[in-house]
Amino acid sequence: MSGTNVTTAAVQSQPKQKRHLVRTLGKSLREYRKPSILTPIFVVVEGVLEILIPTVMASLIDEGITGKSMPAIVKFGLILLACSLCSLAAGFLAGKFAAIAGAGFAKNLRHDEFEKVQGFSFTNIDKFSTGSIITRLTTDVTNLQNAYSMIIRLGVRAPIMMIVAWIFSFRISPSISLVFLACIPVLAFGLCGLAVYVHPVFERVFHTYDKLNNVVDENLQGIRVVKSYTRESHEIAKFGRISQRIYKDFSKADRVMSFNNPLMMVCVYVSMILIAWMGAKQIVASGNNAALGLTTGDLTALVTYAMQILMAMMMLSMVFVMCIISQASAERICQVLNEESTVTNPANPIKEVADGSIEFDNVDFRYSDNSEKPVLDNINLKIRSGMTVGIVGGTGSAKSSLVQLVPRLYDVTDGSLKVGGVDVRKYDLEILRDQVAMVLQKNVLFSGTIADNLRWGNPNATDEEIRRACQLAQADGFIQEFPDKYDTYIEQGGTNVSGGQRQRLCIARALLKKPKILILDDSTSAVDTKTDKLIREAFHNEIPDTTKIIIAQRIASVQESDMILVMEEGRITASGTHEELLRTCDEYRSIYESQTKNQAQPEELK
């Protein structure tokens, strides 16, 4: 299934994901729960102190300045200073803990996502494109980090300030305080309208980001092909089209979200005008006498509270906008975290593989439940431990699909597959895969020294064991020619070694596992025939008890096998030794003759 097809499945499962969104993401807090709790506490302290300041200021004006009392000025001045300093300290600590909580949450979230991906089966991985997973690990996590930091700080501060400031303003003037309440439904209606319209746009943006990352990943992996075919301009144009799509969607979202600020400012200006007008009328009516009505100090406090309430509303609108953006990211991250691997350990797994025998019993296999036709159809096969089995067949005959079932990279759809006389689904996955070494078609080396790469097969391998494995894989010769020998640094993807050298290093890495089953999936295609023969001879002489399955395009690579399978369209159409198949299988004979061309016919066909 392609990366884009995950969108349909995601849409169908969104209601369930939304119900468990907070619960799923909350598991990633762990050791950062403490700063996540401390942040709101210090925010509340900061907010309450800031709200006390206008009341203290009103007393300072009315009792100190208007009343011409120096002791009152000193008293309320010191209280004002103490409130300001304590508020500053609380704000600093709130910011510090919010940063720790946000960054820690993001770190754990990335780790949890990556760990989840590592536990995926190939079926799970096929649902997501590389670019999609990269976006979810980077852009989406960053969006959630920013939103979380804002929620635990501004999301707590704003409502506290709004509620407490309104209570204080109500104590001063109930009629004027109602002005603030009138703004709330206007803002709520406007913000909800923006959210409903913009959320689908941001979802579309992040899916487009997936495509952009796919283009970059594909281009960098195939950069040599791009340059050899001078297709740079084509790739630039393709990248530009997707980038333009992101630009258009973001511009559309920004245009809509830009109404947020004007709406907020209209509420601010209208509120200030009404407060000033109503306050001035009451001051004039009372003659600035606190006993008769509003005073100048009270009006100053009301204006300050008005600004605090409206600033709190602006904070809430910022948090709201960030939540709209991050909701799409949260849903995409939860798609990964809630994805259940299709290949899991049984309740009481078997911890030992007896031998390298393999038995396919009426095995059918589909990559997807939606597939009309099975990839493998009614496979019946018995391989004794220690046998060498060759597999040949045309492109698309499901040779690789067959062998990928042995280490449970995929599970069979129907039937059963046994290794060592036990169904593979009963084994502990790690134990099974440690005993089945597989060299895939695409040979991958990682950044690091040759020795580091080889120790992927056995982290505790000694230098002697590494060299012995390389000798069997015919890799020791060219390694010794490097100036740094086994300490030679391999560039990312193994770009500084040839295809044949890369294949031999991967074979050596597999041999270091000392497996009971060794699978070579067309893993000597870049090796010359002489070296290929030396590798097979080394296998025959040095690891006779290991079951060896060799997929190859060259008949020469498999003709000495104990049994050769001929596959076509997911079925085993013939099996036998090289000589038997030459006599009985037209397809095998055709492949052999096309490769030997003008060579004389074998003795057995005369």
PLM regions with names:
Residues 14-18, 41-42, 49-62, 83-130, ...:
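Juxtamembrane helix-loop junctions of ABC transporter transmembrane domains
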Residues 1-50, 57, 65-79, 94-98, ...:
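Membrane-integrated ABC transporters
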